[in-house]
Amino acid sequence: MSSSRKILDAPKKFREKLKDFNEERKKPREPITTKASMFSIFSWAFYDLGNTIFSVLIVSFYFGLWVVSDEVGGTDSDYGYANAISMALVFLTAPLIGALSDQARRKMPFLFVTTLLCVAFTALLGYEKDGWSKSTILTVSLIFFVIANYFYQAGLIFYDSTLATISTPGNKGRIGGIGIGVGYVGALVGILSALFITDTLGFPYPAVFQLTAALFLIFAIPCFIFVRETPGDNFWPSLMILMATLLGINAWLVENNMLLRYTTVFFAIWCVFSS
């Protein structure tokens, strides 16, 4: 078929696709409560609200502001390096976490542990003891940030996999959309709360870190309690698949050592531009 013929047929194919799309839209949609109640769905979505508060207040705004404040005298580079290190750790361990998430009979225990660790180290940001210098306070908090952000990112992998617990292929997109929408509410809640305690009440930035930890935990609790998993009886087959996956990842990394070099260069460039 000539190129001119393809151009002439394009409007016809577009109309056919549009017709198929409209016919698909007319079909009755599967209710979002097919697999779980609306209460369970919003309990799941509230976790998204909580972790968005962490993302906005800690990763995007207040921790970086605290690092460069006169209180500790850090630089943008200090925060950039810490963020790069935490993301590098996520990048290197994501295949293992993903394999574990895919093959584990229950995801919620892993989500619970990663969330608690993130919350604990978030609450410790800005921690200081009598006699500590500014550089010591900064270094300790940067280490805590690396750990908190790592477990936040790891928790996202397990959280996303729990969507299958409350959804079906027919309503997964809409339920996921509810989580995203509730997450945007979390951004607003976090910013307004932080502004209130810093600008109105006059608390220092570390109070925002503790507030973030508390809000994250509070909004995560409904997900842990009311989202019920139904684990199957395939423990040993899943364990075998998991081990085979991990061995396959290890073999691939050994054979493709270029990945390590690429990762090193990538994060070196990131650190340079962050400084």
What is the predicted role of each segment?
Residues 174-195:
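Glycine-rich segments within core transmembrane alpha-helices of 12-TM secondary carriers
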Residues 121, 134-155:
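Hydrophobic core of transmembrane alpha-helices in multi-pass small-molecule transporters
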Residues 115-134:
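C-terminal ends and interior cores of transmembrane alpha-helices
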Residues 194, 214-232:
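C-terminal membrane-cytosol helix-exit motif in multi-pass small-molecule transporters
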Residues 101-116:
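Cytoplasmic membrane-interface "Motif A"-like loop-to-helix N-cap segments
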